[in-house]
Amino acid sequence: PDPLAEKYSSMSPYMYCGGNPINAIDVDGRSTWVVRAGKGKYEVVGGNLYDNDRNIYVGTLDKKNNKFTREYSIGITTSITSFYYCDAKEGPKWSEESIIDVNDRSGYEFLKKIMSQIPPMIDDYMLNARTGHRYDFKVTNGTDHEIEGIDIYRGMPVGVTDKGQVIFSSARDIGNITAGFIAGVNGMPWIPSRLAFDFYQGGIEGISTRNAEFYGWQLGYYNTSATQKRDNLMNSLGSAVMSLFKSFKNKKK
């Protein structure tokens, strides 16, 4: 049995939007288009922002006429913008040429570890979620160092729905899902969490980031009892105080 599927049975990457995508995710939906790249890999070639569909479709692309012919779906995405780069410098665009690897379990293992261990929010998660640090999954892939040249929009499976559909996410989304989850599991309401994320980043975050953070926040907030959220927050505060005390003692030596 899958421990995450059991722990977060009502809403998790294993039950897309808790079985109610209209309430949890934008009603318009989004589909992502990919072509075969061999050995369980698929290359992102575009998508449709207005087709009321969140599937990842495999098909063929007529580059001359820029026409995509759909064949079948390999699953769905965690967020409406998982493979859509809303805040690219040259303007919003699909993460074309990014690879979705159905055999890559790194994102699944990363989320599984976070959700089972729940690191203290302040002196552990916030300290190590900065760019290039171990919780910055998009560039570290779950390691303790930044991996040079790694694609932040590489895709991978993170679970299945209650109907058996595979759920995929991008590496960038996985890191932001984690941020939202940590806030939610510590009992932080969404609006204060949203403001805290913007403050932490030094400005208003893009919609791609916000969508993933909200998805993660729902996982943590709605699947954790009030008592457990209080305990998680107290543990986070206690850990931060202890870290501060140790730092003060070391400076005095």
PLM segments and residue spans:
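Active-site or metal-binding loop neighborhoods of secreted/extracellular toxin and effector enzymes
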Residues: G91, V102, S193-K253
